[in-house]
């Protein structure tokens, strides 16, 4: 099953997440199909906190991809801000 989920990066105590489309059988930080955005929870100043390609997310959801709970909340926040 294909899912849209977060992939953790960054350093210890400074997380940075890529929003990716991946096969659910792959590891959290493993192989993915497409990168559709990022989420930086520790962004400060004028640094960008959230960037999502809503058109590509819409495409993947239309083809049957499941969305993780956290990514669903991020999509809702991004749509509200746009």
Swiss-Prot record:
It comes from the Bacteria. Keywords: Ribonucleoprotein, Ribosomal protein. One of its GO terms (molecular function) is structural constituent of ribosome. One of its GO terms (biological process) is translation. Pfam families: Ribosomal_S16 (PF00886). One of its GO terms (cellular component) is small ribosomal subunit. The keyword Iron-sulfur does not apply. The keyword Chloroplast does not apply. Belongs to the bacterial ribosomal protein bS16 family. HAMAP family: Ribosomal_bS16. This is Small ribosomal subunit protein bS16. The lineage of its organism: Bacteria, Pseudomonadati, Pseudomonadota, Gammaproteobacteria, Aeromonadales.
